[in-house]
Amino acid sequence: MSLQLSADKIRGLLPQAWADIDIDLYEEIDSTNMQARRDLQAGLYRPKLIVAGGQTAGRGRRGKSFYSPKEKGIYMTLVLQPTLPLQQGLRITAAVAVAVCEALQPFSQEKLGIKWVNDIYKADKKICGILTEGISDFEQGVLKSVIIGIGINLFSQEFPEDLPVAGTLCAAETISREEVIATVAKKVLESIADLENPQLMHKYREYSTLLGQPIRYEYNGVTRDAVALDIDEDGGLIIQDRDGNRHILNSGEVTVRKDTR
């Protein structure tokens, strides 16, 4: 396998409490999140870490694709069964974003930040995308399984022209992939176990790249201008529109406005 990744090495870097987690490695796959869904559909309800060297159909938020060239990034999915209330979904997304940002910061010489909801940026370049999905039990009102997909642009590469804001975490291929994978997985596992931590949203606000910024957001197919004011305790983005009215966004696409007229 050209990946030359070791499941044993990754496992050895994880906390002892997660030493028995299943770890599946692929040289290339369509999508680690899609593989996670296939495993769940087959009845494999166990905590699992899926890692691929490349993806042929990587998935991002809102149905977008995620550029996933072989050997230039880390494409991983954690499958967990936390049995959480459905309304915790957005808070899970925020917790994972904070965890990934904290995990990747030691590998970057520049400060990292979170662009709401859960893209990780270095300066003005996106270096990591996160896609959280859930398998729910509506009768019991709980999330049975959570699928956490994390795509990291690890090493320097040429990106397609239609990805002008894409960037990379590291300039040189000198860091251990296993160390990055294990560090990210460890932080995410800790964050899900500590979801009620009152410091969570405080940390998210500190990492946010949007607060106080003029923004343009798309919601229900309509684009509007506003200012990002705050993040609420559930991870919603509090904004103020041009008429001075305040709203809370729980989903949608947001960008910083260059034209502030």
Task: Label each region the model flagged.
Residues 2-9, 18, 86-88, 94-112, ...:
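Long, positively charged amphipathic alpha-helical accessory segments at protein N-termini or as interdomain linkers
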Residues 1-106, 128:
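N-terminal lobe of the biotin/lipoate ligase/transferase fold
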Residues 27, 114-116:
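Short loop/edge segments at beta-strand edges and connector loops
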